[in-house]
Amino acid sequence: MSGALQWWETIGAASAQYNLDPRLVAGVVQTESSGNPRTTSGVGAMGLMQLMPATAKSLGVTNAYDPTQNIYGGAALLRENLDRYGDVNTALLAYHGGTNQANWGAKTKSYPGKVMKNINLLFGNSGPVVTPAAGIAPVSGAQEMTAVNISDYTAPDLTGLTMGAGSPDFTGGASGSWGEENIPWYRVDKHVANAAGSAYDAVTDAVSAPVEAAGNYALRGVVIIAAVAIVVVGLYFLFQDEINSAAMKMIPAGKAAGAAAKALA
């Protein structure tokens, strides 16, 4: 077995624990990482189900590159989204783009279709037949997944998600799309941190050799300060919409804290 199916036993166990159809979890694994547990996205999402560091921590995942921890963490997040929204399609949108629907860009909106294509490849007529392990039952009702012919796929149980013919795309998911659309405000800090690190390294690498050759430590300090200033200013202009959005969301909390402090004074 290759791709997501090499982790089928763990997928089945995690699906049983969180009352998920294992085909749904396998589809997410295939879409996010093609079954490679060392996959890392450009914005820091990690492992088989591409968990962001903050998300992994909140789910109790201490090593996102550990296949078992990652799959259980991703399954827990899918269960949380299914409980929140009540249908698979919206749960997948939130898995990819976060819970703020205003930030669901074009690639997030295409994400459920990619997952379903991979499910059909893995379990439909064009893919290998895999029988779930004993005791692993698909969820029922609106959350049930059904393997069907991809060429005329319409799934009422996925809020009418319709897909046309085409080859499955294994390059999508968080590792291939985050950073190319609006980033949920609560992920801005990680996104900016990654960009800041790359920009700082590029600036300092460009000037470090001649400065070190000159042996001028004072000049080296000035260069580092200038590099930091350039990075900060550049990042603000690059991410000003996201930063301003995050700041605006913090204003009400700040006002409330100020009012509380004033009342206690």
From Swiss-Prot:
The keyword Cell wall biogenesis/degradation does not apply. The keyword 4Fe-4S does not apply. Residues 19-98 are annotated as: Slt-type domain. It comes from the Viruses. Keywords: Antimicrobial, Bacteriolytic enzyme, Capsid inner membrane protein, Degradation of host cell envelope components during virus entry, Degradation of host peptidoglycans during virus entry, Lyase, Membrane, Transmembrane, Transmembrane helix, Viral genome ejection through host cell envelope, Viral penetration into host cytoplasm, Virion, Virus entry into host cell. PROSITE patterns: TRANSGLYCOSYLASE. The chain crosses the membrane at residues 219-239. Pfam families: SLT. Gene3D superfamilies: 1.10.530.10. One of its GO terms (cellular component) is virion membrane. Its EC number is 4.2.2.n1. One of its GO terms (molecular function) is peptidoglycan lytic transglycosylase activity. One of its GO terms (biological process) is symbiont entry into host cell via disruption of host cell envelope. The active site is at E32. It catalyses: Exolytic cleavage of the (1->4)-beta-glycosidic linkage between N-acetylmuramic acid (MurNAc) and N-acetylglucosamine (GlcNAc) residues in peptidoglycan, from either the reducing or the non-reducing ends of the peptidoglycan chains, with concomitant formation of a 1,6-anhydrobond in the MurNAc residue. Heteromultimer composed of proteins P7 and P14. Belongs to the transglycosylase Slt family. This is Transglycosylase. It comes from Enterobacteria phage PRD1.
